[in-house]
Curated annotation (Swiss-Prot):
Keywords: Cell membrane, Cytoplasmic vesicle, Disulfide bond, Glycoprotein, Glycosidase, GPI-anchor, Hydrolase, Lipoprotein, Membrane, Secreted, Signal. It comes from Mus musculus. It is a lipid-anchor; GPI-anchor. Optimum pH is 5-7. Disruption phenotype: No visible phenotype. Viable and fertile. InterPro entries: Aldolase_TIM (IPR013785), Glycoside_hydrolase_SF (IPR017853), Hyaluronidase (IPR018155), Hyaluronidase_PH20/Hyal5 (IPR001439). It catalyses: Random hydrolysis of (1->4)-linkages between N-acetyl-beta-D-glucosamine and D-glucuronate residues in hyaluronate. It is an enzyme of class 3 (hydrolase). This is Hyaluronidase-5. Catalyzes the hydrolysis of hyaluronan into smaller oligosaccharide fragments. Does not appear to be essential for fertilization. Disulfide bonds join C60-C351, C223-C237, C376-C387, C381-C435, C437-C443.
């Protein structure tokens, strides 16, 4: 058995009468505030925050007989080209229709430009591809990942400026009397119109064939807030990029989900800039999600990675998880999609490393933030919405308080929660967060936090907090956080010990270990 103890330094550092139905009378007696902010309803009932796994890690089991604990993820799919019928389906440029592009060696595919491809032929091939990769219309995510060119002319800067240059050449060939300025204007109009029709009609086709899937484009919206070298970097999305996103209203109107990305480079490791970078990108997605209908916004599923984009064998730990996952949940999105490459599962060692990372780092943090978010939602929203920051640009996070909660890793690869919520915990939620109501629900935010007497929330694997709310942590049993063992032959490492997040595999099963995960800037304080 193993105890995962998230110390305060990590999350600050862990984490029918009178003719009326009785339920209505009870509801009317609960003091509430009207909520004016909305979020998309859950894709899966009773799963307000959805975790999806989209990495080719099945070979850990099929090749190396090393299963991975992905039980916390509602949707698990592989991005391999051979994989079909996945709950998360990602369409790359070679998997959906006749996507026009020019590769790095300047080879031209399908005309190279959206102006030159036959839309009719593209849709015919795309229909076949959709039916192949989605043989059944189950509930799931449909993500189109086309990154060779951008539908906004101005965003095709180097090296994507080849699409602007080729478009200008095309206009000049067709209209030899035009001067360069006129050719650029015509080329821009033709390119953007063709790109719009190409992307719009693809979305419409997907929705018509597989309406139970949520369709959208990966990396949309983006806000290009990656100039980390600028002094006093604040992560803000440039106004010009917000205006350009506004001009892409046609994408937001046809999409049924948004899929922004918050991948980190190693230069942002344990950096406050990472939180600012992620926060502003997610907030821009929230803004865009309301373009079509502020009272019925699009769901937002944020793509993230558990490794750095430039160091694919270095996992995200401690601060980095708070700066990515913690930020995303605190802003009130619909879920996250973990994407990865073959590097996660190429060898037996990489599979063992991934197994240990899941068990000791990622899964405990997912449990932490999931239960904290659900507890806040139950307290403030009566489970009819999600909690989101009152000040979106603050450092307020949804973490379990380490002073009265512990996450234990027990026998048979299971986790359990020890401790009780305190009134102070619930008041923190009320002070720092608001209820963002699910669309189509008459949701109100609860005001009488002091009257909440119980909390009952669970993750997917029935890891639960089912307990009374205590007035103070002093009411906890004296031995509530006492380490205990799988058998009498096992010894323990004292709870004040700190060990590396990268726990050796020999320590993953066996005697109790207390993980004290530290952070300089965390992010739960009462």
């Amino acid at each position: 058995m193993r105890v995962l103890y998230f110390k305060h330094s990590f999350f600050r550092s862990l984490l029918k009468s009178n003719g009326l139905p009785q339920t209505l009378l009870v509801f009317l007696l609960i003091p509430c505030y009207l909520t004016v902010d909305f979020r998309a309803p859950p894709l899966i009932p009773d799963v307000p925050f959805l975790w999806a796994w989209n990495a080719p890690t099945e070979s850990c089991f099929t090749r190396f007989n090393q299963p991975l604990d992905l039980g916390l993820f509602s949707l698990v799919g592989s991005p391999r080209k051979s994989a079909t019928g996945q709950p998360v389906t990602i369409f790359y440029s070679d998997r959906l229709g006749l996507y026009p592009y020019i590769d790095d060696s300047q080879l031209i595919f399908n005309g190279g430009l959206p102006q030159l491809v036959s839309l009719k032929s593209h849709l015919e091939v795309a229909k076949t591809d959709i039916l192949h990769y989605m043989p059944i219309d189950n509930v799931g995510l449909a993500v189109i990942d086309w990154e060779e060119w951008r539908p906004t002319w101005a965003r095709n800067w180097k090296p994507k400026d080849i699409y602007r240059n080729k478009s200008i050449e095309l206009v000049q060939q067709q209209n030899i009397l035009l001067n360069f300025t006129e050719a650029v204007k015509w080329a821009k109009e033709e390119f953007e119109e063709a790109a719009r029709h190409f992307m719009e009609e693809t979305l419409r086709l997907g929705k018509s064939l597989r309406p139970n899937h949520l369709w959208g484009f990966y990396l949309f919206p983006d806000c290009y807030n990656n100039k980390f070298q600028v002094a006093d970097y604040k992560g803000e999305c440039p106004d010009i990029e917000k205006h350009r996103n506004d001009a892409l209203f046609w994408i937001w109107e046809e999409s049924t989900a948004l899929y922004p990305s918050i991948y980190l480079k190693s230069s942002l490791k344990s950096s406050p800039q990472a939180a600012l970078y992620v926060r502003n990108r997610v907030q821009e997605a929230i803004r865009v999600s309301k373009v079509k209908d502020p009272r019925n916004p699009l769901p937002i599923f944020v793509y993230f990675r558990i490794v750095f984009t430039d160091l694919t064998y270095q996992y995200l730990y401690e601060d980095d998880l708070v700066n990515t996952i913690g930020e995303t949940i605190a802003l009130g999105t619909s879920g996250m999609v973990m994407w990865g490459t073959l590097s996660l599962s190429q060898t037996m060692k990489s599979c063992l490393d991934l197994h240990d990372y899941l068990k000791t780092i990622l899964n405990p943090y997912i449990i932490n933030v999931t239960l904290a978010a659900k507890m806040c939602s139950q307290t403030l929203c009566q489970n009819q919405g999600v909690c989101s920051r009152k000040d979106w640009n603050s450092n307020d996070y949804l973490h379990l308080n380490p002073q009265n909660f512990q996450i234990h890793f027990v026998k048979h690869g299971k986790y359990e929660i020890r401790g009780n919520p305190t009134l102070e915990n619930l008041l923190y939620f009320s002070q720092k967060f608001r209820c963002s109501c699910f669309a189509h629900l008459n949701c109100q935010e609860r005001a009488d936090i002091e009257s909440v007497s119980t909390v009952s929330v669970c993750t997917l694997e029935d890891i639960c907090i089912n307990s009374l709310v205590i007035s103070d942590k002093s009411e906890l049993p004296k031995d509530w956080n006492r380490p205990y063992f799988v058998n009498s032959n096992q010894s323990d490492i004292t709870s004040s010990a700190t060990v590396s997040p990268c726990v050796p595999r020999k320590d993953v099963s066996g005697y109790l270990v207390v993980l004290s995960l530290y952070s300089q800037h965390l992010k739960y304080s009462l």
